[in-house]
Amino acid sequence: MFDFDGTLFCETDPTYFDWLLFERRVLDDPSYRPTAEQLAAAKASRSRAAIPGLTNDRERLMLEVYEGMTLEAFEAFVRGFMQEPHAGFTGMKRGEAFYLPMLEVVDLLLANGFSVYVCSGTDRLVLRPVVLSKLPLPPQWVIGSDSTLLARAQGTCDGLAFTYRKEDELVLGGKSIVKNLQMNKVSVLVREVGIRPVLAFGNSSSDISMLNYTLQKNPHRAMGFMVLCDDLAREYGNAGKAEKMRSACGKNGWIPISMRDDWKTIYGDGVERKAGTAGGR
């Protein structure tokens, strides 16, 4: 079981992929007319005056801007952003920012008969195009946060009182159902996977519940791993956060993975961090 941002994929340059997608929708999409609140939030984060934390307001804003989009249009929007250059690196697009050493771990597990799941706080419909562009996983093994889906003709009618018609289409409803972090990761794993993982990989406090659940009363040998953001030269690391997580690993029996000390490369040949830039960890 793998977390995504900061575990398999670049987490903050200067912030999360899903929020940068929000900025693109609000500031760069001529087909969209943002509200004053959305515009202020997007401008503040793009200028780095105020990058939001993982709050309910952040989640609400991110979902509202896509309300009414078809699933096909939204996937195309995500894929378009994936093709844009990565702001803080040379030689890499937004959708290519996977940690190569972690992809090697995934490949090794798949080659030895393991089922590999991704369990992330990123919205499921954002997560799938990115993950499936690189990993040979079935889409149902890519688990993220969930938001409402509606039939175009449904309006405000409750789903129990509405029948989907042959001529209808699905659109994004713009409201959160569950943010897949902390204890919510455990609940989602029980509902969607149905068996306890034997390996769990994370990188932050929002993954602790997933690791504890994996290690608790497991009938099989189980291990938990935390990726440390301790590389300040090749990545946008944070020494303080990395050291805090290293200490937590020692106290909880998790295995630390050091970007700085354990990885010969992060993104591969030809990819370099731009001089004079600073990430958002």
Predicted regions and their residues:
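Asp-based phosphoryl-transfer active-site loop
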Residues: 1-14, 211
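Short, solvent-exposed loop/turn and secondary-structure capping segments
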Residues: 11-14, 19-22, 129-130, 213
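Short, charged low-complexity intrinsically disordered segments located at boundaries
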Residues: 11-12, 16, 47-55, 71, ...
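A metal-dependent, Asp-based hydrolase signature
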Residues: 14-16, 20-96, 100
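C-terminal cap/substrate-recognition subdomain and adjoining C-terminal extension
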Residues: 76-281
